[in-house]
Regions:
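Canonical positions in the second alpha-helix
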Residues: 49-50, 85-86, 121-122, 157-158, ...
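Bacterial N-terminal signal peptides
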Residues: 3-13
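N-terminal leader/linker segments that initiate helical-solenoid repeat arrays
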Residues: 14-41, 45, 196
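Terminal, low-structured helical/coil segments at or just beyond the last alpha-helical repeat
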Residues: 168-202
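Helix-start (N-cap) detector for alpha-helical repeat units in TPR-like alpha-solenoids
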Residues: 20-23, 56-58, 92-94, 128-130, ...
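Structural signature of tandem alpha-helical TPR/SEL1-like repeats
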Residues: 37-46, 73-82, 109-118, 145-154, ...
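Short helix-capping/linker turns of helical repeat alpha-solenoids
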Residues: 32-34, 52-55, 68-70, 75, ...
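Hydrophobic face of amphipathic alpha-helices that form TPR/SEL1-like repeat modules
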Residues: 22-32, 46, 61-68, 97-104, ...
């Protein structure tokens, strides 16, 4: 099952730490209660001001807040409007979330072709979650003709960025010779890498 649960992606992914805009940073601070009292309404206001300056991270944040109903009434139509603005300006996170909406049929008719199109654009801009999910779409023939070699290619890209889900897939593909030549040594390498990452997170 493709991992496109937007609510899970809000925290730590939607609002990256290294955003340049001070207005955006102010909104992020209010969203998380970082140095100030947590206040979603003030966060939304700051994001709206940042969006007026052309901040695409802010546009994406506003879109998701409307869709998930954080600090504002739930409004898929308005949320999609903001996501579309950012996605059409080649913002990889917005493209990914928009693809997720089409994949899940949230606020729009379910459309796997459009989901694949947006997620592919995001993946090709090196957005990690899009790369993993694009691999899943290739593996399962969702929105695209099933292609295990392409699935392997994108899983490997994401695995090298320490996506544990992708590493599990790559280990399995090497073990069984799925989408690539069977290679037990490489399978064991990735299984070992997964254990190393688990140890680092403890």
């Amino acid at each position: 099952m493709i991992c496109l649960l937007i609510i899970t992606l809000l925290f730590g992914i939607l609002f990256p730490v290294n955003a340049d805009s001070s207005l955006y940073e102010r909104g992020r601070a209010y969203f998380y209660g970082d140095g100030v009292e947590k206040d979603y309404e003030k966060a939304l206001l700051a994001f709206e001001h940042a969006a007026k300056t052309g901040d695409l991270d802010a546009l994406t944040a506003i879109g998701i807040m409307h869709i998930v109903a954080i600090g504002v009434e739930q409004n898929d139509e308005k949320g999609l409007e903001y996501l579309n603005k950012a996605a059409n300006q080649s913002h990889p996170k917005a493209q990914y979330y928009l693809g997720a909406m089409y994949y899940l049929g949230i606020g729009v008719p379910l459309d796997l072709d459009k989901a694949f199109s947006w997620i592919s654009l995001s993946a090709n801009q090196n957005y990690l979650f899009a790369q993993h999910n694009l691999a899943e779409m290739y593996e399962n023939g969702k929105g695209v003709t099933k292609n295990l070699e392409k699935a392997y290619e994108y899983y490997l890209i994401a695995a090298r960025k320490d996506s544990v889900e992708s590493q599990i897939k790559i280990a399995e593909m090497y073990k069984e010779g799925i989408g690539t030549v069977k290679n037990i040594e490489k399978s064991e390498y990735w299984l070992k890498r997964i254990e190393e990452l688990k140890g680092m997170s403890q």
